Amino acid sequence: MYKRQILNLTNIKAEKEEIDSNCFIRIGEVPQVKLQDYVSMVNTNLQDFVMRYVGCDEKIITKVGIIGGAGANELNNAIKLGCDCLITGEVKHNQALEALERGIALIEVSHSVESLFKEYLQEMLKKAFPTCEVLVSQKEKDPFKPFR
């Protein structure tokens, strides 16, 4: 299952040139949904990951930004791009407070969420470089254990 299925995204695109050349946010659209319902759907699809979120449960989400790793530092760019919600792997406390103040939802899904896309990236690299062996780490795991 890849990003678009996990997050129910359509029309995914890179917007880095629109803001600045260092912006790595990908933008996608979702059918109009309340934040609480969207978080529930993402949580169901990412059941092996611990997640948390910031924002008003009733906020309507239609445009979602996603960036792997500690991407909450892209909050300003997400707002400039018109995102209702930013999904990332790591959020600091002050970034969560800023998101609340500025009215954008944040979903923190675990820094290790990037692992979901390793096989997809492997397929892309094999097609681009058919004479090279492309391996995916089988040892790298999320160091955190979920406690439910």
State the predicted function of each range.
Residues 3-148:
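Active-site catalytic microenvironments in core metabolic enzymes, especially phosphate/sugar-handling
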